[in-house]
Regions:
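Transmembrane helix-loop-helix hairpins at the membrane interface
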Residues: 80-217
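Membrane-water interface of alpha-helical transmembrane segments
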Residues: 1-2, 47-49, 113
Length: 217
């Protein structure tokens, strides 16, 4: 946890430096840069919209993750690898990592870097920092870049960083809990050794080539 505090602290400092030198806020875009500013001039209204978009993005991403892990082999393998890499985490540590990563990474990537590099390049860089030791982790990198693109578009649309931060926290919190609690290997093993259901009382069984009622026990 100590290393994470240092890394996130450095990211926050870098974000504040980048935005401070340009006289900008790391939490919102200038009105003329937000795509919806013409239709929704009030920042409070755009912030509320940003929050709604963030909650929706977070919920959809969490649901998609669970569906992919339970229905595709590549996602299941990735889940197993990430689970081994992360190890056991308490609820408090999950909450800590979800909040600190969600706030810090969004302030740095969307709040500070995106106005300089643009939505697409920032999303690619966001994906590039989510890499693993082997090719199994490639979908994780691509997924992170895709989510970064959605977060970036949300920020550019509303001009408020609240939605991307909330979405990031929701995704990390829910998916870390899922990562720790769900073990596909154990589930698959239990399914293979589950005995067949016993013959129902009154069902017919074949004996000596003819069907006879099963004897109740």
């Amino acid at each position: 946890m100590g290393a994470a505090v240092v890394v996130y602290g450095l990211l926050t400092a870098a974000a504040l430096l980048l935005t401070g030198l340009r006289g900008r806020s790391p939490l919102s875009l200038p009105t003329d840069e937000a795509w919806l500013a013409g239709a929704i001039p009030a920042l409070t209204m755009r912030t509320a919209l940003s929050l709604a978009i963030g909650l929706g993005l977070g919920a959809c991403a969490v649901r998609a993750t669970k569906l992919l892990v339970t229905r595709t082999r590549w996602a299941m393998r990735l889940h197993v690898e990430l689970r081994a890499m992360v190890g056991p985490l308490s609820g408090a540590r999950i909450a800590f990592f979800a909040v600190t990563s969600g706030v810090t990474e969004e302030i740095f990537f969307r709040g500070a870097l995106q106005p300089l590099a643009g939505v697409w390049l920032t999303s690619a860089l966001f994906g590039a920092v989510h890499v693993g030791p082997n090719r199994t982790f490639l979908p994780w990198t691509l997924w992170a870049a895709f989510m970064g693109l959605l977060f970036g578009l949300s920020y550019q649309l509303t001009g408020s960083l609240l939605g991307p931060v909330v979405a990031h926290i929701v995704v990390n919190y829910a998916n870390l809990h899922y990562l720790v609690s769900y073990d596909p290997v154990t589930v698959a093993r239990e399914r293979r050794i589950t005995p067949e259901a016993p013959t129902l009382v009154g069902a017919r069984v074949r004996t000596s080539g003819r069907s006879t009622p099963a004897e109740p026990r």
